[in-house]
Amino acid sequence: MAKTIAYDEEARRGLERGLNALADAVKVTLGPKGRNVVLEKKWGAPTITNDGVSIAKEIELEDPYEKIGAELVKEVAKKTDDVAGDGTTTATVLAQALVREGLRNVAAGANPLGLKRGIEKAVEKVTETLLKSAKEVETKEQIAATAGISAGDQSIGDLIAEAMDKVGNEGVITVEESNTFGLQLELTEGMRFDKGYISGYFVTDAERQEAVLEDPYILLVSSKISTVKDLLPLLEKVIQSGKPLLIIAEDVEGEALSTLVVNKIRGTFKSVAVKAPGFGDRRKAMLQDMAILTGGQVISEEVGLSLETADISLLGQARKVVITKDETTIVEGAGDAEAIQGRVAQIRAEIENSDSDYDREKLQERLAKLAGGVAVIKAGAATEVELKERKHRIEDAVRNAKAAVEEGIVAGGGVALLQAAPSLEELNLTGDEATGANIVRVALEAPLKQIAFNGGLEPGVVAEKVRNSAAGTGLNAATGEYEDLLAAGVADPVKVTRSALQNAASIAALFLTTEAVVADKPEKSAAPAGDPTGGMGGMDF
C-alpha cells in the first residue's frame, strides 16, 4: 500500500489535531460536574459513560495523521487504566496540556530533546513529592470516600468499603448484573470454585439442594477416577476414621462413581465427588492451591503418587465444605499458614510478570481465593443502558479503592498536582531542560482548571486561589466550597495521580521529538458499478 509522509511542523500539528479531537471528547467528563458521552454501538443499545478509556477506545479518525495522534493518546488512557484502574481522563487532559505547551516551545526554536529531558526530570520530581505527601488509608470511611468519588455515588463507595472490610485488601470483589433495582452485597468465606457435585445423589440437604460435609478429608487427584479398585484402599482407611470424604478430580465416572453413590444412599459412608475447575495447566495450578490451602497433596503421576498407594496423610482437611450443583466452597482449610503465604507471594510475582490481561485476571482470582475471600456486588437499574454504565462505574471504583489502599491518598480535584508544582524549583535546571520543567508546571494546572470549567467556574481564578492556599486545601467542585479536601473526603489514590502524570509525560515526550510521520495513503473509493447515467440500459420510454 502507498504511504504518505508528513515532516516537521506539519507532522506534529497533524498528530496534535488527532490528540485534541480525542481529548476534547474525553475531558468534558472530568470532575463531579462532568457530563456523559454517548457511544453508538453497531448492535444493541448505545453506551452512556463518563469513563475516559471507554470513550477513547471508540474514537477512530479519518485523517491518517490525526488517527495516529489519537491512537497515541489512547495508549495513555489504556496504560493508566491497566496500572491504576482510574484516572484515564486526568491522564488525557495532562497529555493534551503537555503537548500543547511543548509544541509551542518547539515552534519557538527550543530543542525537543532538551525539552524531553526537562519533562522527564520534572515528572520524576513531582512523583516523588506526591508519594511523600500521600496519607495512608487506615479507615473504612477513607476507602468509602475515595471509591465514592470515583463512582460519583457515595452509596457505591460505602458498599465497596464494606466489601473490602469483609474480604480484605487482597480479596476479590466482582460486579454482576442483577434483575432487581439497587445494590446488594454477597460474601463468600473461604475458597469457592465453579464446579458442583457430579451426581444429585450426593445431596445432604434436600430442601436447599446442597451437600454439606463437616470436618471432611479432601482427596485431590489430577486424573480421572473410573475403577473402584484404585479407590478402595484409601476409602477403607477414611471409613475407619469416621469422617466424610470430598473427592476433587478431573472426573469421577463409571464404577467408582456408582460405588460412592450406593454407599451414600445406604448411609454406609458419606462422600461427594466434584470435577476439578479449569483446564490444562490452570487446573493443575488450582489443584495445587487447594492442596496448600487444605494441607494435602495432589495425587499425580507427575510427582510419583498413585491412588493405589496413597495414604491418608496425603489428604487435605477443612472445617466445612458446602457443595451445590454449580459451585463448591471450602471453609477454613487446614493448610500451614506459612505455606499459604509462600503460595500467595508466588502468585503475586506471576501477576507482576504477566503480559496478558486474561491471565492476570485469573491469577488475581486465585490470589483472592487463597488470601481473602470473594465479595459479589450485584447492581441493578431500570434500563440496560443504565445498568451497563452503572456496572462499569462500580468496577472502576473497586480498582480505585484498591489503588488507594496500596499507595495511599492525596487531595483530589487536581489539587495535589497543582500544589506539587513548587517542588520543581529544587531542580535548578537551565536552558531547554528548564523550559521542559516549566511545561510540566503549566500542565499540572490543567486537571484542576478543567474540573472548574466543567463546574461552571472561572478556571484561572480557581487555579490562582488554590495555588495560594494551604497544602491539601482546594476547590470541592461538588459544593463550590474551598476546604481541606482530605477532611471533606475528596481524595484520589496517589497511584492514580502519579500514573496519569507519568503516562501522559511519556507520550508527550514522543510527540515533541517526532520529526516525520509515515501513514497509509487513503484509498480513493471505487465508483459504483452499473450504468453511469443511472438509467436502465436497453429500455425505451
Curated annotation (Swiss-Prot):
Keyword Membrane among UniProt keywords: no
Binding positions for ATP per the UniProt entry: T29, L30, G31, P32, D86, G87, T88, T89, T90, G413, N476, A477, A478, D492
Gene Ontology annotations of biological process type: protein refolding
SUPFAM superfamilies, A to Z: GroEL apical domain-like, GroEL equatorial domain-like, GroEL-intermediate domain like
PROSITE patterns associated with the record: CHAPERONINS_CPN60 (PS00296)
GO molecular function, one term: ATP binding
Subcellular location: Secreted, Capsule; Cell surface; Secreted, Cell wall
Keywords: ATP-binding, Cell wall, Chaperone, Isomerase, Nucleotide-binding, Secreted
E.C. no: 5.6.1.7
Cellular component, GO annotation: capsule; cell surface; cytoplasm; extracellular region
Principal location class: secreted
Catalytic reaction(s) noted: ATP + H2O + a folded polypeptide = ADP + phosphate + an unfolded polypeptide
Keyword ATP-binding in annotation: yes
Record note on quaternary structure: Forms a cylinder of 14 subunits composed of two heptameric rings stacked back-to-back. Interacts with the co-chaperonin GroES.
NCBIfam families: GroEL, PRK00013.1, PRK12849.1, PRK12850.1, PRK12851.1
Family: Belongs to the chaperonin (HSP60) family.
Protein function: Together with its co-chaperonin GroES, plays an essential role in assisting protein folding. The GroEL-GroES system forms a nano-cage that allows encapsulation of the non-native substrate proteins and provides a physical environment optimized to promote and accelerate protein folding.
Name of the featured protein: Chaperonin GroEL 2
Organism: Mycobacterium sp. (strain KMS)
